[in-house]
Amino acid sequence: MNYLQLPKIDLHCHLDGSVRPQTVIDLAKLQDVTIPSFNVDDIKALMVAPASCPNLDEYLTRFALPVSVMQTEAALERISFELFEDAAKENVKYLEVRFGPQLHQKMSLNFEQIIGSVVKGMRRAEAQYDIKGNYILSIIKVLPKDDINDVIDAGAKFLNNGVVAFDLAASEEPGFCHEYIPYAKYALEKGYRITIHAGEQGVGQNVYDAISLLGAERIGHGIHINSHQQAYELVKTEAVALETCPSSNVQTKAVESIESHPFGDFYRDGLLVTINTDNRTVSDTTMTKELQLAAEKFNLTEADYFAIYKMSVDNAFTSDEVKLSLLKFID
């Protein structure tokens, strides 16, 4: 397979984990933000997580630096544009980007300005490249809950016009879904689709809860359903798609090694699985790298890849018109 030339879909990609290191330097200079160095190699070293982190929390420390310069409308628009540009250049045809609007208020932007800026950057890239996209709004679980509905309300103005879904992100504690039932219900009432980070860090019950309590149609990661029979069966019977991110899962110790990643077993058992980057910069990856890794480690043929691509299309939070256009790339 020519991994670079194959059409690709990425349904799980974080904006703040996919910023170009040079852009952090450029924006720090423009905004007069203090950063540790203006050397691009130094900045990249601070943004890329080690190949093996002790845990997810250590991995998440890599986001503070890019977030520090993502506090203006111009910065958010630029970073959004550049992410879609980078993806388009490796034949990603559809990209769903998630980000937490709550993290971008240090310069007093309101949520509508924040969301509008990233959508504007995406639209600029769509006009320039052969790529389509949408945004997912991630609620950061370690932050106060008092403005969650404000995020949902602001995003609702862009629903099906750049914004499509609601997500819960950040470190994963057992039973977290119970605290977010009213917010997921509110998002559903507004018309959001639901995808939830769950089952990344060894808690299969969280996947069961995300589907049964929060209405999740897709699960971010979800790999630890392999140790929770009820969650596994629910994912299978309800046809819930798993957004797997192989490189990231190895880095965060969600799995010990790529060889022990359950992706291949899930695929061969008929689960809906997709291949995604998670964080292009923090994990120092691309969709091309992820596809090659998955193909080589899980013995995927080109026919397997096209089946997985089709699963990604079927489970994308986009219009039937866009889905039909994406399927034409594998006709």
From Swiss-Prot:
SUPFAM superfamilies: Metallo-dependent hydrolases (SSF51556). Zn(2+) binds at residues 12, 14, 197, 278. The keyword Metal-binding applies. Binds 1 zinc ion per subunit. Keywords: Hydrolase, Metal-binding, Nucleotide metabolism, Zinc. The record marks 221 as: Important for catalytic activity. The active site is at residue 200. It catalyses: adenosine + H2O + H(+) = inosine + NH4(+); 2'-deoxyadenosine + H2O + H(+) = 2'-deoxyinosine + NH4(+). Substrate binds at residues 14, 16. One of its GO terms (biological process) is nucleotide metabolic process. GO terms for molecular function: 2'-deoxyadenosine deaminase activity; adenosine deaminase activity; zinc ion binding. Signal peptide: none annotated. InterPro entries: A_deaminase, A_deaminase_dom, Ado/ade_deaminase, Metal_Hydrolase. Its EC number is 3.5.4.4. The keyword Hydrolase applies. Catalyzes the hydrolytic deamination of adenosine and 2-deoxyadenosine. Belongs to the metallo-dependent hydrolases superfamily. Adenosine and AMP deaminases family. Adenosine deaminase subfamily. This is Adenosine deaminase. It comes from Shewanella pealeana (strain ATCC 700345 / ANG-SQ1).
